[in-house]
Amino acid sequence: MTNVCDLTDRKCKPCEGGVPPLEMEEAEKLLKQLEQGWQLADNKISRTFSFKNYYQTMAFVNAIAWVSHREDHHPDMMVGYDWCRVEYMTHAIGGLSENDFICAAKVDMLFKS
């Protein structure tokens, strides 16, 4: 079974469509490997992170941008003064792929550091 260490050690694989999204059962298994707070709904996973101030929020957003660039897999983000909501979905397949969970695990690791 995949665990968080496995997910953070993996690299995203290019996905340009032509493969089906993860089945709900597999997505739920992978969701259990992430930190608490991630929600699975509407063919995406999302989590809202809270911070003490705007500077910490923006530092986190920029760190996510760096990880996203390295993985070539980008989330949708909504940002407020002391919060950031991160949503992953593989748009090319209209649902979730393992890439979404790999990146979510890496975002969790960033938040803990």
UniProtKB/Swiss-Prot annotation:
A Gene Ontology biological process term: tetrahydrobiopterin biosynthetic process
Keywords, alphabetical: Lyase
Keyword Ligase on entry: no
Catalytic activity: (4aS,6R)-4a-hydroxy-L-erythro-5,6,7,8-tetrahydrobiopterin = (6R)-L-erythro-6,7-dihydrobiopterin + H2O
Annotated GO MF terms: 4-alpha-hydroxytetrahydrobiopterin dehydratase activity
Listed PANTHER family: PTERIN-4-ALPHA-CARBINOLAMINE DEHYDRATASE (PTHR12599:SF0)
Family recorded in the similarity comment: Belongs to the pterin-4-alpha-carbinolamine dehydratase family.
Name this protein carries in UniProt: Putative pterin-4-alpha-carbinolamine dehydratase
